[in-house]
């Protein structure tokens, strides 16, 4: 196996370009310290008019929906769900696709963590440090590689300044929730002088085990277990009453969470260019609900509607409960960015990004003994330049990444693997009268080098063509045809052993081929006066779709799952509407509604349903704004999911009623926002069908949160 230094040598070759940019910075006059900010988005071209659906959360809208995980924060975006694993973990699922098919990024560089490796691994991108969050729905492989075949979530942090602020500014917020006694605090500071700018941010979160409306296990799971016990009694001729363990009730065992992190960033900014860096760290310790099948002693018939009595005594010392597995992680990340306007004739802007991450976590068993150690050292860089050629506004670039991954211990279900990726891409857009045309291509080479066994290499090609046609002044019709390819990830190729997060034995297949997807999507948009409306539909035809097939056998009472391939089809549609019903000086009344649905099936077989596909969702909401007062109420109906895969249990639907009230005031020149939020106000039992542990761990019960945010 090649050394890590040699693996990354090609990546660091791009860093030499930074030296040239830095030299140019030094040669430029410093008479103008504040330049027009280089706009950096998940897409290098203008987000306005893209054929691909894009959703952006920022400002007050983002503050209203912030949650402990990225997936939960994005819950209101049509087509986006969360693959939760307790309150600590919630990776986004876009249009039914998640895991290695959705790329989670921080400032256009991959998160570089191990959240793709297992559903119980936390994503290291923190929502509370975000300036904005962008979602590219649908294939985004042209820009970001095969890991984005289902879409992209990009969190913009502002940690590397692009301009020198005129004044020192900052913000601080603290919020506290009754459920799980959760406390979150975060703050940031931005300043600078001359040609230099700096950024500081930090956050802290602490939460106990959270309260749930009823049993931890679903009714379907309890019925299945009861049937199995009945069958066992019949087999042994034993008809005595079963006196087994009492089920967890009212509190989800081992769902506690503690996390902290922060970052320092600085930039040198010239007249036409800049160079900057950021250094960040992230530490967390959280319980893994569902890792063990231990139960509390009693669920208690005295459980009342508030299900909070005795909660303070239930959780102690954050994860020291006997029988509960705990994950303890630490990450250090370094980011570098440099940009220049008009560096050469015909090139409008040049941007270089590099991210390096050193990550490790230890999974402690219930006894407190260290179990499996997951570690990764990863680096990703991209050189991107925008230009005009043949009438096209375009962006071309190079992307190189290197990842050294290892898992050592009892739950090490995959061997150490080194992954190398190299990509070349081009995307462009042009107008022909009112008709807008988008096109792009990408070539990518991926090497997977395991510690033992055969190295695999993949050559991948992707292409896209999109059209945007205005239909009068109010309507716009857009369509996009994509062909994308994805290389199998290490877990799909080389898994071989028990994986307790998925409650299974996972067997990889080192002979897997690349996965291909032909996607056709269309979007109709209406915008006029007080009404905005969009309707999207899509169909994706997968060739050699990679999935885990249940073999029907068990080892040590765990089902054996085999990574395999088959053709599959996903289809769905989304609707989103906003109506500004009333307006007055200082505010107004706005109503909104939404709907999304996705269907995913293999093209052949007895049970063709792909597991963990989200059910239909309906959303209604209203926002009232009057001077300093804002109030928002929203209701979401999540349907039953009965179209289940092999050995998958159906999931009951639920309602989610939420309320957010905010009040703004000024203390001197400093704006302050007070807010009160209520989530799951009807205390419904909410189980996410996208979660591996949905039958063992429901979402939080009724939660009331209060907080304050101050800016200066």
Annotated model-derived regions:
Residues 70-73, 90-93, 102-105, 120-126, ...:
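N-terminal periplasmic accessory domains that precede
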Residues 27-63, 71, 99:
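Short, acidic, small-residue-rich periplasmic hinge/interaction motif at the N-terminus
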Residues 213, 485, 541-543, 642, ...:
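C-terminal beta-signal and adjacent terminal beta-strands/loops
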Residues 110-139:
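Short acidic/polar hinge/loop motifs at secondary-structure boundaries
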Residues 376-385, 423-425, 512-513, 519, ...:
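Outer membrane beta-barrel strand-and-loop segments of large Gram-negative receptors
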Residues 253-255, 259, 273-350, 356-378, ...:
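Flexible loop and strand-edge segments within Gram-negative outer membrane beta-barrel domains
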Residues 392, 432-434, 534-542, 559-642, ...:
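Gram-negative outer-membrane beta-barrel transporters
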Residues 180-206, 218-289, 328-347, 392, ...:
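Transmembrane beta-barrel wall of Gram-negative outer-membrane proteins
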């Amino acid at each position: 196996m090649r050394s890590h230094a040699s693996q990354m040598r090609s990546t660091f070759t791009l860093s030499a370009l930074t030296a040239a940019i830095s030299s140019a910075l030094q040669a430029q006059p410093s008479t103008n310290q504040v330049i027009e900010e280089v706009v950096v988005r998940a897409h290098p071209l203008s987000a306005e008019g893209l054929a691909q659906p894009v959703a952006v959360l920022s400002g007050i809208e983002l503050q209203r929906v912030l949650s402990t995980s990225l997936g939960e924060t994005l819950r209101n975006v049509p087509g986006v769900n969360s693959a939760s694993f307790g309150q600590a973990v919630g990776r986004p699922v876009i249009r039914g696709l998640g895991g290695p098919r959705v790329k989670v990024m921080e400032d256009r560089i991959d998160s570089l963590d191990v959240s793709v490796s297992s559903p119980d691994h936390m994503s290291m991108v923190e929502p509370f440090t975000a300036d904005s969050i962008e979602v590219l729905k649908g294939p985004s492989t042209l820009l970001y590689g095969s890991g984005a075949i289902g879409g992209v979530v990009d969190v913009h942090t502002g940690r590397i300044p692009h301009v020198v602020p005129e004044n020192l500014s900052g913000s601080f917020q603290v919020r506290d929730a009754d459920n799980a006694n959760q406390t979150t605090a975060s703050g940031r500071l931005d300043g600078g002088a001359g040609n230099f700018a700096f950024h500081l941010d930090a956050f802290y979160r602490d939460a106990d085990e959270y309260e749930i409306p009823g049993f931890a296990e679903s009714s379907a799971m309890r019925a299945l277990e009861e049937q199995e016990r009945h069958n066992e009694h019949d087999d042994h001729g034993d008809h005595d009453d079963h006196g087994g363990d009492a089920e967890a009730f009212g509190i989800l065992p081992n769902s506690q969470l503690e996390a902290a992190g922060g970052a320092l960033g600085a930039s040198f900014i010239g007249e036409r260019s800049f160079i900057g860096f950021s250094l960040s760290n992230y530490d967390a310790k959280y319980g893994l609900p569902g890792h063990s099948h231990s139960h509390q002693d009693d669920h208690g018939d005295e459980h009342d509607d508030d299900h909070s009595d005795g909660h303070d005594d239930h959780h102690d010392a954050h994860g020291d409960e006997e029988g509960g597995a705990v994950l303890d992680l630490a990450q250090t990340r370094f980011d570098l960015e440099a940009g220049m306007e008009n560096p050469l004739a015909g090139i409008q802007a040049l941007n270089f990004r590099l991210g390096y991450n050193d990550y490790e976590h230890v999974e402690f068993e219930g006894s407190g003994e260290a179990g499996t150690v997951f570690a990764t050292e990863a680096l990703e860089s991209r050189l991107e330049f925008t230009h005009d050629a043949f009438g096209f506004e375009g962006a071309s670039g190079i992307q190189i990444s290197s990842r050294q991954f290892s898992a050592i211990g009892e739950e090490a279900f995959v061997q150490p693997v080194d992954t190398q990726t190299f990509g070349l891409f081009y995307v462009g857009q042009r107008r022909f009268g009112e008709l807008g045309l988008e096109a792009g291509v990408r070539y990518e080479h991926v090497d997977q080098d395991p510690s033992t066994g055969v190295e695999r290499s993949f050559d991948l090609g992707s292409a896209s063509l999109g059209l945007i046609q205005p239909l009068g002044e109010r309507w716009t019709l857009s369509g996009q045809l994509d062909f994308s390819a994805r290389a199998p990830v290490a877990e799909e190729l080389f898994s071989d052993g028990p994986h307790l997060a998925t409650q299974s034995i996972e067997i990889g297949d080192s002979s897997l081929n690349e996965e291909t997807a032909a996607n056709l999507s269309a979007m109709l948009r209406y915008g006029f006066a007080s009404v905005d409306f969009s309707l999207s539909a899509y169909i994706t035809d997968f060739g050699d779709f990679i999935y885990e097939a249940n073999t029907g056998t068990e080892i040590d009472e765990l089902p054996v799952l085999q990574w395999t391939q088959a053709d599959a089809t996903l289809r769905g549609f989304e609707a989103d509407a906003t109506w500004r019903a009333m307006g007055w000086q200082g505010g107004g009344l706005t109503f909104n509604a939404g709907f999304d649905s996705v269907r995913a099936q293999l093209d052949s077989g007895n049970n063709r349903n792909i597991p963990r596909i989200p059910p239909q969702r309906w959303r209604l909401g209203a926002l009232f704004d009057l001077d300093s007062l804002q109030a928002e109420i929203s209701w979401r109906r999540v349907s039953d999911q009965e179209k289940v895969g092999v050995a998958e249990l159906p999931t009951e639907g639920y309602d989610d009623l939420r309320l957010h009230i905010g009040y703004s005031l000024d203390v001197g020149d400093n704006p302050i926002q007070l807010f009160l939020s209520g989530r799951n106000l009807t205390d419904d039992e909410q189980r996410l069908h996208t979660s591996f542990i949905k039958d063992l761990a429901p979402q939080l019960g009724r939660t009331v949160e209060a907080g304050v945010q101050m800016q200066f």
